[in-house]
Design a protein with these regions (language model features):
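Glycine-rich FAD pyrophosphate-binding loop
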Residues: 25-45
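N-terminal Rossmann-like FAD-binding beta1-loop-alpha1 element of flavoenzymes
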Residues: 5-32
């Protein structure tokens, strides 16, 4: 038997780590290259939801109308930032509108639900096979609606995708008592029992440790540049490798670089959409809801992890490569906690990251310029990650 195939993965977030896991199981020699190490950007403090119930793509006429309405509201769920313009932003927005005009919502949502359901099954198997702990909480997800129009639309969505067996049903009973939330303003809700939450950063770190012990696997803290040009994945380390060097050294190269995939491969229409999160720990999280929440109108998610940690995340900001944590984007998350839970918490940590989004909301799993790509899953990267990693491993 010959030497195992050697594979370089660029990016050590959840896409890179899960891809490495499936490749390692097949006996490949896997080397991850990331300037910051494992899970230090979008896989550091996301909303935590493994949410089949949230697998709808955004390409609808109603979302375009909301986006226009929110243009002048700095604290709106979507901040378009009309003061920031670039060719990549124009191209992405045009692609989003184009995907909406082609009425791809139904077809693409079915695809993301399929990926999400497959990923759920694979995650359960990984947990059983590896025994890693990532503060997973099998609490389900409560999807709440606060106006009649959005609730009527949600009930139609339940019927529309019922055949997918995604497990999302109308929630019954006293929501405040059942889930420990303030429910006065809730018009209707759905519950998805099979959904869960987990700390993505802990998952990536612990799975990386597992692979170091069980696979031919290593992580290198390298910046990656294009043909000697200074186009880096953002990073703290000085050592740099070119994509050409990786292609010459390894049998295959896989780009799992999140939003930075479009820096390394400019032909791909992947845009960095900034999301924010706040995290409460210890006593600050004692009165958190019993289940994970998805507030449809506010576009905010909230997750109680199994280590007395409560994470609230959401909002989308189109501001190119700006990493600033803006107070006017954090405030809606804090206000949501005070308005919707029984928590009286004031101490929290903040985070923001650039999520890799394609215009049609579908991830890119393909070969581009002689390299494989696993990127573009955006806010569903954690939810669909296992299935996407399995798919690209099979394709290779």
């Amino acid at each position: 038997m010959g030497n195992p195939k050697s594979i370089a993965i660029v990016g050590a977030g959840v896409a890179g780590i899960t891809t490495a896991y499936f490749l390692g199981k097949k006996g490949y020699k896997v080397r991850l290259h990331d300037p910051n190490g494992v899970a230090e950007e979008c896989s550091y403090a996301n909303g935590g939801q493994l949410s089949v119930c949230n697998a709808e793509v955004w390409n609808t006429y109603s979302n375009i109308a909301k986006g226009i309405k929110w243009l002048t509201q700095p604290d709106a769920p979507l901040a378009f930032r009309p003061d920031v313009w670039s060719w990549s932003k124009i191209k992405w927005v045009a692609g989003f509108i184009g995907a909406t005009l082609t009425n791809s919502y139904d077809r693409n949502t079915r695809k993301t639900i399929e990926y999400s359901l497959r990923s759920r099954r694979l995650m359960k198997k990984l947990m059983k096979d590896t025994g890693i702990d990532f503060h997973h909480n099998d609490c389900g997800i409560l999807h709440i609606y606060k106006n009649q129009k959005s609730w009527d639309k949600a009930r139609k969505t339940l019927d529309r995708f019922k055949d997918t067996k995604w497990g999302r049903v109308e929630a019954k009973g006293n929501l405040a008592k059942k889930y420990n939330i303030y429910s006065k303003d809730i018009v209707g809700a759905t519950f998805t029992k099979g959904d869960s939450v987990g700390d993505i950063h802990t998952f990536c770190r612990h799975l990386s440790y597992y692979m170091e012990d069980n696979f031919d696997y290593k992580v290198y803290c390298n910046k990656i540049v294009i043909n000697k040009e200074v186009k880096y994945l953002s990073g703290k380390r000085d050592h740099a490798r070119t994509l050409q060097e990786l292609k010459e050294q390894y049998d295959e190269v896989i780009i799992c670089a999140g939003a930075y995939t479009s820096v390394l491969l400019p032909s791909l229409n992947i845009y960095p959409i900034k999301g924010y999160s706040i995290t409460f720990k210890g006593a600050e999280a004692e009165d958190a809801p019993f289940t994970s929440i998805l507030d449809d109108d506010a576009k905010i998610v909230a997750s109680p992890f199994n280590n007395l940690t409560f994470r609230v995340a959401g909002t989308a900001e189109l501001a190119d490569w700006n990493h600033d944590i803006r107070e006017d984007r954090i405030k809606p998350l804090v206000d949501w906690v005070h308005d919707n839970t029984f928590m009286d918490a004031e101490k929290y940590t903040r985070w923001a990251c650039l999520r890799p989004m394609t215009p049609n909301m579908l991830p890119i799993i393909s070969k581009v310029q002689g390299m494989w790509v696993n990127s573009g899953a955006g806010h569903l990267g954690w939810t669909m990650g296992m299935a996407l990693a399995e798919k690209i491993t099979k394709d290779i």
